[in-house]
UniProtKB/Swiss-Prot annotation:
Belongs to the LpxL/LpxM/LpxP family. LpxP subfamily. One of its GO terms (cellular component) is membrane. Its main location: membrane. It comes from Escherichia coli (strain K12). About two-thirds of the lipid A residues of cells grown at 12 degrees Celsius are acylated with palmitoleate rather than laurate. A motif (HXXXXD motif) lies at residues 132-137. It is an enzyme of class 2 (transferase). This is Lipid A biosynthesis palmitoleoyltransferase. HAMAP family: Lipid_A_LpxL_LpxP, Lipid_A_LpxP. Induction: Induced more than 30-fold upon cold shock. The induced activity is maximal after 2 hours of cold shock, and then gradually declines but does not disappear. Induced in persister cells. It is a single-pass membrane protein. GO terms for molecular function: acyltransferase activity; palmitoleoyl [acyl-carrier-protein]-dependent acyltransferase activity. It catalyses: (9Z)-hexadecenoyl-[ACP] + alpha-Kdo-(2->4)-alpha-Kdo-(2->6)-lipid IVA (E. coli) = (9Z)-hexadecenoyl-(Kdo)2-lipid IVA (E. coli) + holo-[ACP]. CDD domains: LPLAT_LABLAT-like.
């Protein structure tokens, strides 16, 4: 039912040699002390910005739409921090995949673990709602060290990278489930598993409702959360990990179980967006603003991106 983490001799083919080289460099890189990794990661992110003009433009537009009350200067400062965080994301991916448990444990603390344990004591599944922070990959590893669970994901097009990322993610978790595998997700929840997923991206018009998100009135929001809730009867809570502002490590936040989740899919979409907004505001400069969150528009409306 779920992807298996099995090595294939095919991965030794020359077409994968460049990927192996990149992975080797990343492995060597993350052997450095964490403060050095932070210094290098933030610098690489800043230096990459001039080469990622399209992504910079997307981030600027997203911030203009979501935070019109902020000055242009404030938003530009957030963009600069966002690109530094993007560089850290590469470092944190290597940390998540290659660091031993003992080293990971030195760099995080947890707030609200009892909330997850209480939800699991109800003998039903738990829908663990996440958001796309730059430290997402490491956050999954950290969450698994606190409480192993399952997670939904999009399979990688490169089969070697698929093996590496699945192997890395399963170092502290139970299984990965393809995000389109509705039967697998619902089945796991009905068996009492905790399953992580992130409903904060634009997945297109099909299966979405338009609901407010920050200052944008109509934002395509997946109905997947609503469908999973109705089919599984699972509890819902959020798990978010942010990088501490002084780069002294990370904090994992686990909120209490959500209450009053709507029975109407449009209201449910608006409800979930409010939850996601609150999580993003823990560290907005670390959120994935380079994603075209507002790509899908209501029929008849023009694109918000030029």
């Amino acid at each position: 039912m779920f992807p298996q983490c099995k090595f294939s001799r095919e991965f030794l083919h020359p077409r994968y040699w460049l990927t192996w080289f990149g992975l080797g460099v990343l492995w060597l890189w993350v052997q450095l002390p964490y403060p050095v990794l932070c210094f290098l990661g933030t610098r690489i992110g800043a230096m990459a910005r001039p080469f990622l003009k399209r992504r910079e433009s997307i981030a600027r537009k997203n911030l203009e739409l979501c935070f019109p009350q902020h000055s242009a200067e404030e938003r530009e400062k957030m963009i600069a921090e966002n690109f530094r965080s993007l560089g850290m994301a590469l470092v944190e991916t290597g940390m998540a995949w290659f660091w031993p448990d003992s080293r990971v444990r030195k760099w995080f603390d947890v707030e609200g673990l009892d909330n997850l344990k209480r939800a699991q004591m109800q003998n039903r599944g738990v829908m663990v709602v996440g958001v796309h922070f730059m430290s997402l990959e490491l956050g999954g590893r950290v969450m698994g060290l606190c409480q192993p669970m399952m997670a939904t994901y999009r399979p990688h097009n490169n089969q070697l990278m698929e093996w590496v990322q699945t192997r890395g993610r399963m170092r502290s978790n139970k299984a990965m489930i393809g995000r389109n595998n509705l039967r697998g997700i619902v089945g796991a929840l009905k068996k009492g598993e905790a399953v992580w997923f992130a409903p904060d991206q634009d997945y297109g018009r099909k299966g979405s409702s338009f609901a407010p998100f920050f200052a944008v009135e109509n934002v395509a929001t997946t109905n997947g959360t609503y469908v999973l809730s109705r089919l599984s009867g699972a509890a819902m809570l959020t798990v978010t990990m942010v990088r501490k502002a002084d780069y002294s490590g990370y904090r994992l936040f686990i909120t209490p179980e959500m209450e009053g989740y709507p029975t109407d899919e449009n209201q449910a979409a608006a409800y979930m967006n409010k939850i996601i907004e609150k999580e993003i505001m823990r560290a907005p400069e670390q959120y994935l603003w380079i994603h075209r969150r507002f790509k899908t528009r209501p029929v008849g409306e023009s694109s918000l991106y030029i």
